[in-house]
């Protein structure tokens, strides 16, 4: 059970609402916390950052990167490894050039699971992402991009992304909604400290991605494994959870990229 104490100052500005579900909602509580921060508040719109959402388009996929550009769904942006193996036809690249991600952008999932925030590093460059993703191109003139990302990914930013100012749940986020989010205009020294930490984390993520790729190459080299093709993925589909567990022994010569999973050897 949740309890709280309110006064007339909380009731009068909110159309005389007295219901507990309103005053105890996270959006209202965190909103009060932000109001009490002793610094000027600024909306994302007033930071002069570019916020936009792509137009719906029909996707034409191709087999490899020779004929396509790496494609990311909204759920892919939060993965440690964004090499999904999906490529959008280069024939679409001109009309969809504005959807190609660049370094130091902020992207936000805006439907389904909404409010997941990602700061793009160099590994995201030259990837086309779904139209259903809010893109923020930060402007450091008033708010440093690292601080903006840190705020949006905090509970104070997440709450504004996923709930209305009256505490209602938001089912879909649009650019106007994001532009209306407010954040404290902290001193430049503090913003720089936060920005430095976010930039460092982005750099470390790049190193982690490179290390993961190197490890994969080493494994394939020493185990004499080849890369999986699209046909391999189609042939060796997901296992059935109703299948009984079994143990067996296989010779090293029987192992390759398509059979390294134990399920593919089971009978």
Report residues per predicted region.
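Non-catalytic DNA-recognition/assembly elements of restriction-modification systems
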Residues: 1-58, 187-267
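Sequence-specific dsDNA recognition surfaces
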Residues: 41-60, 75-103
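Short, contiguous, well-structured surface segments enriched in hydrophobic/aromatic residues
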Residues: 44, 68-71
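Short, surface-exposed loop/turn microsegments at beta-strand edges and helix-strand junctions
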Residues: 61-69, 78-81, 85-87, 99-101, ...
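Short hydrophobic-aromatic micro-motifs
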Residues: 70-73, 101, 106-109
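A short beta-sheet element
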Residues: 97, 108-150
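A short glycine-rich beta-alpha junction/loop motif
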Residues: 126-134, 166-192
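Short, positively charged
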Residues: 145-174
């Amino acid at each position: 059970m949740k309890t709280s104490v309110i006064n007339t100052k909380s009731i009068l500005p909110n159309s005389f609402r007295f219901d507990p579900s309103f005053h105890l909602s996270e959006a209202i509580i965190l909103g009060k916390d932000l109001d009490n921060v002793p610094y000027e508040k600024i909306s994302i719109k007033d930071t002069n950052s570019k916020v936009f959402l792509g137009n719906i388009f029909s996707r034409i996929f191709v087999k490899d990167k020779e004929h396509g550009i790496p494609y990311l769904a909204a759920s892919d942006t939060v993965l440690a490894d964004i090499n999904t193996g999906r490529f959008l036809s280069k024939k679409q690249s001109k009309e969809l050039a504005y959807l190609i991600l660049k370094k130091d952008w902020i992207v936000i999932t805006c439907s389904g699971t909404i409010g997941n925030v990602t700061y793009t590093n160099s590994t995201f460059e030259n990837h086309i992402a779904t139209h259903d993703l809010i893109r923020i191109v930060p402007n450091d003139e008033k708010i440093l991009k690292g601080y903006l990302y840190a705020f949006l990914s905090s509970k104070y930013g997440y709450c504004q992304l996923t709930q209305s100012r009256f505490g209602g749940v938001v089912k879909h986020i649009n650019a106007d909604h994001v532009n209306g989010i407010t954040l404290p205009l902290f001193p430049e020294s503090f913003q720089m400290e936060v920005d430095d930490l976010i930039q460092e984390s982005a750099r470390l993520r790049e190193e982690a991605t490179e290390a993961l790729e190197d490890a994969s190459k080493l494994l394939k080299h020493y185990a004499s494994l080849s890369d999986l093709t699209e046909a391999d993925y189609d042939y060796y589909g997901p296992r059935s959870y109703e299948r009984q567990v079994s143990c067996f022994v296989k010779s090293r010569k029987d192992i390759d990229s398509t059979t390294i999973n134990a399920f593919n050897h089971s009978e």
